[in-house]
Amino acid sequence: MSRLYRIIPMRILRRTPGVKFDEMVPSDIPKIDGIDRVIHGANSISPGPIDDCTPPVQRPWYMHPGQDDNLMVLAGTRYIDIYEPKSKQKASFIVTPEKVYKNDKLYFDGPAMVVWPAGVFHRIISGEEGSISVNFSTRTKKFDLSNNFNIYDLCTETGDYKLLKDGSEDQPDLTYEYPNENIKSLFKS
């Protein structure tokens, strides 16, 4: 059976007035290939609705074929749905910096990392205050940035899914734009 998720608790290291200091036990630290800072505004939905398909899909899903997500919420609230298509397992989490709820019940009373493997569909809503998280990505041999953020329509009853949007369409062009050709030629020579 495929693994749907894992919770990695943080260990309380120290508490002083106004300061909470927690650590992850070294044996629990995942392999880290990338560190992603993700900031959501109030009531953000990720991925957002896809209206240019028939019918429009209000709550689509991401699925990373080559990346495990190791998500830690630092501020605000994240409402996370995950779904594994082979086993048809689904779980919903409400994650804050201090607690993790699973399917609306307190699951862990403390700071923790929520982990799901490559191939698991997921979608997120941030609370009224927005949210900030850090994702410590573990990338497999199948990792490819061009499809890592593809957006899907998913039927959680059958496990059937279809591509709605190529994730590469949202990737920015990171090429520097020189103010003029003179500067560019001087710089490149």
What do the predicted segments below correspond to?
Residues 1-108, 128-132, 136-189:
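Active-site region of the double-stranded beta-helix
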Residues 111-124:
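Histidine-centered metal-chelating micro-motifs
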